[in-house]
Amino acid sequence: MISRIGILVGLGLLGAASPAAAQTLDDALAAAYANNPQLQAERANLRSTDEGVPQALAGWRPQVTVSGTAGYTQGSITEPSAGLLGSTQVTSSQDHQLGTVSAQVTENIYSGGQTKAQTAEATDKVKSERANLVNIEQQVFTNAVSAYVTVIENQQLLALAINNAQVLKEQLKATQDRFSVGEITRTDVAQSESSLAQAEAQVQTAQGNLQTARATFEDVIGFPPGRLSPPQPLALPVSSRRSAAAAAAANNPAVIQAQFNQAAAADAVDLAFSKLMPTLALQGEVYQDVGSVEAGYISKGAEVLASLSWPLYQGGAEYSAIRQAVQQREYARQQLDVARRTAIENAEQYWETLAATRATITSTRAEIAANEIALDGTEREALVGSRTTLDVLNAQQLLLQSQVTLVQNLANLVTDSYQVAAAIGRFTARDIGLHVPLYDDNAYYGAVKNAWVGTGDPTANSVGDPNGSPEDNLGNGNH
């Protein structure tokens, strides 16, 4: 399980203790895990893919057919009849009921390996879709973290903008007072007015950005943000760029999905070859026929037949299908290589970005301290005439820019850490210890795999299994 480490997120307010009723990042992730429609849709898609296995296993099972007919026939037969008075015609009625009933059982003894290949292919497709579900889960979580952090980031940027506007408003008043006594010129006043107007525009922009961030939060999480507790970056299970790359190559869900896609493509080749093989089936039938020949006619019996079929030539389509399957297998093999390289590249990039963000935070804190000293000195020097109003405004702007940069970098530190976790395949509900009932990807599969009949959802009343999740056995060959 990935643990959390503490960090001061922001300037003053961001690092302050959160209210007891504040929403946490875990709250947001739990809501997304339970309600996000993209994740819910992918779970339904996995359950649909699960059905491929019982459909393939049906090839081992008997096929039972019952048929019958019922009816009524009308007719007559006229026959010559010899009597004392000579030959006469005698007509007899043939009106009667008729019907047939039969039951037939067919069992495939050998299908050229078709059922075995179909089952293997369906199973590998299930494993592939489970990996894709993990990938979607990580995407939803990454979006949730970004939405959560962006709201807090924009709240703090708005606070900085409001504070800056307030400072410049007070500075404009002081500038106007000094102008009224002739210490400075009208140009100094105009410069202060311009800076205040720009600051007020920045407040409006920050307010708009915050509203956009809140809307994104509600879209991803499912409810509007309240008082948000400052999030913390993840303590990652990797300590270097190399270890991050190795973990991504082994655990990234896109890589695991590509591995099972390749396995399914190999199964498809076997399936295509099976179409050239003979098939052997055993068929048993019991029947009864009443009245099909004449009134009172009854015929009943039973039979057992073995049928052997060997397709010698079907126009060449089967050979084309084999060649096609072989090329699809090669495509899947190359796609696995692409997925692995992409996962490694992303892990390395996110790791370097995270390291750069950490270093930038340290330098930005030092920059803020220096800018605060510089602003204080510039203001003092301006009072004695050795610095201009423009110098003071520039110093104030430099301090604001460094404060904004720190807020942005602290926000990036959180999101970057989660990006690394996702790149190495370790950003799931189980990995971060999220306190929610975990979705059991095996529940539906286990319920339908050996189901011979039934059309309802066998897990419709299942909420979740804390002991199971889509990522439990991915990549270990256990399912």
What are these regions (language model features)?
Residues 3, 139-249, 261, 350-353, ...:
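Periplasmic alpha-helical coiled-coil/stalk elements that build and connect Gram-negative outer-membrane
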Residues 6-16:
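Bacterial N-terminal signal peptides
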Residues 18-22:
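Sec/Tat signal peptide C-region and signal peptidase I cleavage site
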Residues 23-41:
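Short N-terminal segments immediately surrounding and downstream of signal-peptide cleavage
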Residues 24, 63-135, 254-339, 350, ...:
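Small/polar-residue-enriched beta-strand and adjacent coil segments characteristic
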Residues 32-38, 223, 250-254:
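Short loop-to-helix capping motifs
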Residues 74, 407-479:
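Acidic, low-complexity, intrinsically disordered peripheral segments
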